Amino acid sequence: MSKSPVRVAVTGAAGQIGYALLFRIASGEMLGKDQPVILQLLEVPVEKAQEALKGVIMELEDCAFPLLAGIEAHSDPMTAFKDTDYALLVGARPRGPGMERADLLAANAQIFTAQGKALNAVASRNVKVLVVGNPANTNAYIAMKSAPDLPAKNFTAMLRLDHNRAASQIAAKTGKPVASIEKLAVWGNHSPTMYADYRFATIGGESVKDMINDDVWNRDVFLPTVGKRGAAIIAARGVSSAASAANAAIDHMRDWALGTNGAWVTMGVPSKGEYGIPAETMFGYPVTCEGGEYKIVEGLPIDAFSQECINKTLAELEGEKDGVKHLL
């Protein structure tokens, strides 16, 4: 029996990441090759953006995707999020030249408060929300706090790009296929302070830490490379990573919806105090997914260096949270 279509809302739909994302969702890469989708696309109510969105929709139509059951264009989150089952919040205010961090937080607080309220009012009660737009953890926290009638666990932030970047660096270092790496974790904020942790990782049952056996490489090469990869891409391409971010969003949502078969992945999720992180902090954790639910991998030993890294990324997140609390 064929499945009923699910509703997938995407914000910033005519942007670079949106363009790299929508065709893959419509082809079934995110929710499976048997799951029809209706795309509910949100762009800002500015003529240029709405015109660009029309062009993207024409292209989606021209692909004749068998799974694409409908496309809608919206300029208001209250209509874009109506009955949505999945919401990918990609659109955010980028940091402009000379813009202070406080201004960036305030501009995004406005966007994500409105979107959280709209989700609260009109989305499916089981909606799965992924915030991609930066600062992703804090934007997800703002949306969650603005949607008191939805379960906090429905709100997540994207750390999968950091996770995939870390896996790729480990594959290059060990000369092993990236798909063979298991039990990799990324802790904390989606920012250069994130802590990519391969202490538990294995390749073919063998410890990655033992294979690499180089703490200096970990500290001075691996962590800075993963942490500053976004900046390196901007320096090289002149624009921020879009295709790799879209790919990570697909990975995150696919695993959450369809499960990970016991494999660890990284998601930014609201803490309930795991590993001493204050409750409600939107924090990157290793998780497994099954039956549409994620579960934090608990009971992992945290050594002194790891604790130092976790404390640093937590301090940054707490600072961001303090920077927006008067706006909530």
Curated annotation (Swiss-Prot):
For binding substrate, which residues are annotated in this chain's numbering? 95, 101, 134, 165
Which residues participate directly in catalysis? Answer: 190 (proton acceptor)
Q: Known InterPro entries for this protein?
A: L-lactate/malate_DH, Lactate/malate_DH_C, Lactate/malate_DH_N, Lactate_DH/Glyco_Ohase_4_C, Malate_DH_type2, NAD(P)-bd_dom_sf
Under SUPFAM superfamilies, the record lists: LDH C-terminal domain-like, NAD(P)-binding Rossmann-fold domains
- Quote the catalytic activity from the record: (S)-malate + NAD(+) = oxaloacetate + NADH + H(+)
Q: Which amino acid positions bind NAD(+), per UniProt?
A: 12-18, 108, 115, 132-134
GO molecular function per UniProt: L-malate dehydrogenase (NAD+) activity
Task: Name it.
Answer: Malate dehydrogenase
Organism listed in the record? Leptothrix cholodnii (strain ATCC 51168 / LMG 8142 / SP-6) (Leptothrix discophora (strain SP-6))
